[in-house]
Design a protein with these regions (language model features):
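NTP/phosphate- and nucleic-acid-binding module
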Residues: 1-77, 81-96, 102-644
Length: 644
């Protein structure tokens, strides 16, 4: 067999080997003095431990500790040691899933007693005790039947094996020849590299993320090859906690949830509603300037509508159960595409009518498993900045450029930094995955590449990632917590116009199907507000801040309160969100305005009244400034107008 080894310097070495060989043996064949930093390898792109056997032609790449996959394999090894520790301390516990998540690891297990944070400390101490000696983490691979027999006393393991192993071998990890855990990842072969770790929390987690299943206990932790880097990670986690939009949302009274209303259904409080409303006003104005026509469509749609669009067949699991009344079945809409198609179809269209740009700030409902719900990031009710543009094929290039320019302008104003751009294209060799029209695909993809070059944009081509119905362009950002998300999207759809028989009359009096451009501006308001909260740590720019000015009278004299009220009314007349905070000592009130991150606080006392001016302090600054009211209003109005 022929094995191509991609060296760390990028060069390729080819070996012709007769018999099966492990990654470790191959590494030793390359160099007798094995680099101890190499801990795994990829076999045709799949991560494997060093003792995995190579049996046929393959492309191999060795993985070092500081590689991204190196962190993954270390984390999974930590999860195995944690599973072993739990079984030693609580023999009746049933280990379900040990896995990794971003730069951390976790273990889900079933145990009759709820473990406390005090017990978490004892578990960590026991792990450290176990790790004094080098523990073997041995991979054991069996047939499905053998694996089911081996794990017969663990119903969770049995279910996992049945769900994830249709054919072929199923591997488990045997830790210290005592604890056997069904594998859901790849672990290091022994514990020698596991020196620096920290258990973070013990929480509840539903089996397989489904709230209809049993609730298990989950222990989460982090680890690293370096003590210094582990400390850095812990500091970073603390910073992430302080930036978590769920924490900030509660502290700043932005939003709340209540299970009596329904899981995953966000409730915007007055402060949150101000942010949402101001964002909407800004985006509506931008869309107006870019020639969009706003529409409003029902939050319900008939099942027949979604059957015709194809969503019923391909998206049904993410839709709520239909409401059956009389002879009709209605469903809460998960998207507006079919509704906007009905608007297009409501009139006869000429080629001169296109592009037709429809926008809607649309309330949508999508079913998410309760275990996946995460604050405002993953919800069941959301409002989307949605648009569908109906264009002729020859207009695609120009319309794409307009869409991107609008997106770029909005993201710049909102201080959102683009991480990278991706262009999802079809795989021409896969004739079943994509709508079958080679000419249309080739022309569309060529046009998109040309316009991206004209805009001088760097992008990542993603072959095989296009939707069934057309190519897709995504704007990716990295949140303050390090998550990569798609913030904006431009997607071309050749298929939906055909499904709904949408046409326009061309210059030769022929009926032609338009192309639909799906344009997402900032995604949903819910997720975008979560992103903003975490990015700015709850400190909004003046124009977006829910509470812009706090007036703090030093005393309760009649003339002081009269002056404060006069300031209040004048600021409100200038559309500045202003309030008087008069209860409590002046010190406590100053602390409150800082805690609530109000951009400006005005102090009013006898001196300010006598001189007919005011003393203000900006959030985050220690020094106060004395100005006239007109100077103050001019300063703030300029900031609001310029969105700074």
């Amino acid at each position: 067999m022929k094995i191509n080894v991609i060296k760390l310097n990028g060069k390729t070495m080819t070996y012709n080997i007769e018999n099966p060989i492990t990654g470790y043996q191959l590494l030793k064949q390359e160099n007798e003095n094995i680099d101890s930093s190499i801990i795994a390898f990829t076999l045709n792109g799949q991560l494997k431990d060093l003792y995995w056997e190579i049996k046929e032609d393959a492309e191999i790449k060795f993985i070092k500790k500081d590689d991204a996959l190196g962190w993954t394999i270390l984390n999974y090894g930590c999860a195995m040691i944690l599973a072993h520790t739990i079984k030693l301390m609580y023999p009746q516990a049933l280990i379900t899933i040990a896995n990794t998540n971003d730069n951390s690891f976790y273990l889900d297990f079933d145990y009759e007693k709820r473990l406390s944070n005090d017990e978490l400390i004892k578990i960590e101490e026991k792990m450290r005790e176990i790790l004094i000696k080098n523990i073997e983490i041995k991979r054991v691979c069996q047939t499905k039947e053998e694996s089911l027999k081996t794990h017969k006393d663990n119903p969770f393991a049995l279910e996992y094996i049945k769900l994830n192993n249709v054919n072929g071998l199923k591997c488990s990890y045997l830790v210290d020849n005592k604890t056997l855990v069904v594998a859901s990842g790849v672990a290091i072969n022994n514990s020698s590299s596991i020196k620096y770790f920290k258990l973070l929390s013990i929480t509840g987690a539903y089996w397989l993320g489904n709230d209809k299943n049993k609730q298990l206990q989950r222990i989460s932790g982090i680890c690293d090859y370096s003590k210094v880097k582990l400390v850095d990670k812990l500091n970073e986690l603390e910073e992430q906690k302080n930036r978590d939009h769920r924490k900030l949302g509660k502290e700043l009274s932005i939003f709340t949830f209540n299970d009596d209303c329904g899981k995953g259904l966000p409730i915007f409080l007055p402060n949150g509603m101000v942010i949402k409303k101001v964002l909407q006003e800004y985006l509506r104005k931008q869309e107006f300037m870019w020639d969009y026509q706003e529409v409003a469509t029902p939050v319900l749609g008939s099942v027949e509508l979604y059957k015709k669009s194809g969503h019923w067949d391909h998206y049904r699991e993410n839709m709520f159960t239909p409401i059956k009344k009389e002879e009709e079945q209605l469903v809460l809409r998960p998207m507006t595409c079919p509704h906007h198609c009905m608007i297009y179809k409501s009139a006869l269209r000429s080629y001169k009518d296109l592009p037709l740009r429809l926008s809607e700030h649309a309330l949508l409902y999508r079913y998410e498993a309760s275990g996946a719900l995460t604050g405002l990031e993953r919800v069941r009710s959301m409002e989307l900045t949605d648009s569908h543009i109906f264009v002729r094929f020859d207009q695609m290039k120009t319309e794409f450029k307009r869409c991107y320019q609008l997106i770029a302008e909005v993201l710049k104003t909102l201080n959102i930094k683009i991480d990278y751009l991706s262009l999802s294209l079809r795989d021409p060799a896969d004739k079943e995955k994509y709508f079958n029209d080679d000419k249309m695909w080739n022309q569309a993809e060529t046009a998109l590449r040309e316009v991206l070059d004209e805009l001088q944009l760097e992008y990542k081509p993603m072959i095989g990632e296009a939707a069934f119905y057309g190519p897709k362009f995504d704007v990716q950002i990295k949140t303050a917590l390090g998550h990569e998300i798609t913030i904006s999207t431009i997607q071309f759809d050749f298929l939906l116009p055909k499904k709904f028989n949408l046409t326009y009359i061309d210059e030769n009096n022929n009926e032609i199907n338009p192309v639909i451009v799906h344009r997402g501006l900032i995604g949903t308001y819910e997720r975008f507000i979560a992103t903003l909260l975490e990015q700015n740590k709850g400190v909004f720019p003046l124009w977006l801040a829910p509470r812009q000015i706090a007036i703090l009278p030093i005393n309760e004299k009649e003339k002081t309160l009269e002056y404060a009220n006069k300031l209040l009314q004048t600021c409100k007349q200038h559309n500045l969100r202003t309030e008087i905070i008069s209860s409590g000592t002046i010190g406590k009130r100053i602390v409150e305005t800082q805690t609530q991150k109000i951009p400006y606080q005005i102090i009013i006392g006898d001196k300010e009244i006598e001189n007919n001016n005011l003393s203000y302090r900006q959030y985050g600054q220690k020094e106060s400034k004395i100005v006239t009211l007109s100077e103050f209003l001019k300063l703030l109005t300029k900031q609001v107008d310029n969105k700074i």
